[in-house]
Structures are given as structure tokens and as C-alpha cells.
Amino acid sequence: MHTGQHIRTDAGSSWFFDAGRIALDFAHTGGFADDSAGRRPRSQLGELLASPADLDEWLSEHTEPIDVGASGRELQDARALRAAIARLAVAAAPAPASTAAERTAVAAGLRAGAGRTRPAPDDIDTVNLFAALPDVPPSLPGGRRRAGANRVRLAQALSSVARDAGALFTEVGFDDVEADGRPTRLSRCSAEDCGLVFYDSSRGGTRRWCSMQRCGNRAKVRAHRARRAAE
């Protein structure tokens, strides 16, 4: 399974976003979730799973080729899983550090991210329900045959996504710090008009933006204009 995809907004802008985990990539294939506490604005993402064929294509590209195409009901089920993962991600991701000093403290392990909320039991149940299904079996490359080749069902692919979500949220938890005391690797984009959630796999845990192409560059432009105005 690989991560990263081109996403777009309802307004038509598009950029490449690697959320760092396949479950988070799946969560960002449309809409995304409101922050019920009102801390962050909603990110209005365009719908990437508009049809059963879109779902087949996405899962085939990110897991294994799907043997039998999705039905309309399976598309609804997949969107329900997506919404549950998105809400859990918003609940688990702390508000981004707003100052350089806070970012340094978080990276050094001196400050845990704040602003998490309690997850909804129904969302946890949804992820667990899909994760309980058989997932895509691993296979060792290099052989001439592969057991189960061309027999990956849509339910298996969704189970793989759900299991990744389960592993992710077990790792990061929903408290202010992880079980081992380290700051969480789950972060929100620091842009005020974004709020997308990603898993920060950088060595120092200092990733700030959903994408440098979009929010990172826009922040640089704003900072440059502010410096020019102050001169």
C-alpha cells in the first residue's frame, strides 16, 4: 500500500497531498469533517469517490486490484467508513502549534499537542466493524504465482484501510500524549483556512503543512508581504 494523492476543493484548486497513512488518504477523498469544537474551519474537499468505479480505482491504486466492481450500496458503506475515519482523525489530531517556540517544544518532546476531543463510540464501532473482515493478504514478490491473485474483493480492501486506521489511532491515542509519553505524530495543517490532518513521519516531527505546494507557499507569500509592509 502506498500513500499520497491529488485532491481538489469544491472551488476547483488541486494539489498533491500525502497524509502519511492510507487510512488518512482515504479520509481525504471527499468532504472531510467539521471540527465540532469550532477551532478549525472545515476543509471543503471535492468528491473523489463520486461513483462505484471511482471507489474501485482508488482502492486498486492504493491496495490491490479489485476483482469485482463495487455496487452502489458498497459505495455508501465505503463513504460511511471514510466519514468515521475523518471524524476520528479530527478528534485525535491536536491543534497546530502557533509559534516557533511552541513548534520547537513539541519537536523536542517538551510540549504535547493540545486540543484533542473525545472520539464518538459509533465511529470507533464503524472502523472496528470493517477491520473485523478479512483484509488483503501480504505476498512475497519474486515468485511465479501468488495465492489469491486477482481475487481481492472490495471488502478486503476496505478492511485493510480500516485496520490501518485502527493501528494509527491505537498508536496516537486520543489523550494529550501517546502511551509512551511522546507528542503525537498526528497533526493538522497550520494554515488557518485548511485543517487537513496528516501523520508526520519526518525525523524531527516538524512538518507543518498539508503541502508546501499549497499552504506552505501561501504562508511564505504572506510572511514576505508582511515584512515588506513593515519596511
Language-model region placement:
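Cysteine-rich micro-motifs
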Residues: 205-216
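Short, cysteine/histidine-rich loop/knuckle motifs that typically chelate Zn2+
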Residues: 188-193, 212-214
